[in-house]
Amino acid sequence: MNRTQPLVLGIESSCDETGVGIVRGTALLSNTVSSSMEEHVRFGGVIPEIASRAHLDAFVPTLQEALADAGVQLDDVDAIAVTSGPGLAGALMVGVCAAKALAVATGKPLYAINHLVAHVGVGLLQEENTLPEHLGALLVSGGHTEILRIRSITDDVELLGSTIDDAAGEAYDKVARLLGLGYPGGPAIDKLARTGNAKAIRFPRGLTQPKYMGTADEPGPHRYDWSFSGLKTAVARCVEQFEARGDEVPVADIAAAFQEAVVDVITSKAVLACTENGITELLLGGGVAANSRLRQLTEQRCRAAGIRLTVPPLELCTDNGAMVAALGAQLVMAGIEPSGISFAPDSSMPVTTVSA
């Protein structure tokens, strides 16, 4: 096996995207994604059974397209990497079973990859091809909102803070439903918020009270954590009050004020975590990283704090196989032993476990 510039095939199936990506070392050769999002729209959210069946239908065509785009054959691959968690159990199982079948059929080593750490690994596919020292990662998606410290992407990832209830993306979807904006909620709210007044309504910022924050010397229990369930409830009560009075609901203003509350608390706590933990470089990733206001305010606050911000291209922020392949390549180059084929998908895989 080539351990200096390994050709790695990555498979992603943790939610509603079937992704296959191929990298050679830190060079991206192909990144093919098939999404089942349209099949979930009428339900207002991802239906696990539908997502799993969509992965079954999409995997072989997606694999074939990725190989063709990369100009390689399956036999050329040095190793296979697959998301084994966290995610939807049934969806993960489809990708893991497919990866195991390929590994057995080809005799290639198989690496079970942490989906969240893979979002950091995608930063290695950028121009510099190396992750800097003193690196942090802010991951914001439909299923996760976390701030990480990365000492080594292959074996030393520390969770500094996370949401204690809804993820930010999940809150977007639920509020969009309240406002009649449909699914997915993130893009709809982002677009509508541009026409609204974010200062028209003041929504709460969860876990920002002194009893939760504490101080740098004596941190509170949730200094770097987030909570969005109370914000979601506040939006619902706001809508109910307008409707009870018979007034028109100012949907654009509510969308803008909600988004500002989410982005404000995410960025303020992320920057706080960075400054108090010696983090000088921050990677922003996850599907919600496509949000224009989140990108804007993160950049502003990082610049003010002297933190260098990196945001991958949008197609690499959302779930994809290239990020899985990128992390797999790092494990190969670091001499980490393969996972074998006896591991099981882990829907609640902790971010501190880089590879199963």
UniProtKB/Swiss-Prot annotation:
Q: Which reaction does it catalyse?
A: L-threonylcarbamoyladenylate + adenosine(37) in tRNA = N(6)-L-threonylcarbamoyladenosine(37) in tRNA + AMP + H(+)
Cofactor binding description: Binds 1 Fe(2+) ion per subunit.
Highest taxon in the source lineage: Bacteria
* Compartment(s): Cytoplasm
The protein's required cofactors: Fe(2+)
Q: Which GO terms describe its molecular function?
A: iron ion binding; N(6)-L-threonylcarbamoyladenine synthase activity
GO BP field? tRNA threonylcarbamoyladenosine modification
Keyword set, alphabetical order: Acyltransferase, Cytoplasm, Iron, Metal-binding, Transferase, tRNA processing
Under the heading NCBIfam families, the entry gives:
gcp_kae1, T6A_TsaD_YgjD
Q: What is this protein called?
A: tRNA N6-adenosine threonylcarbamoyltransferase
Species? Arthrobacter sp. (strain FB24)
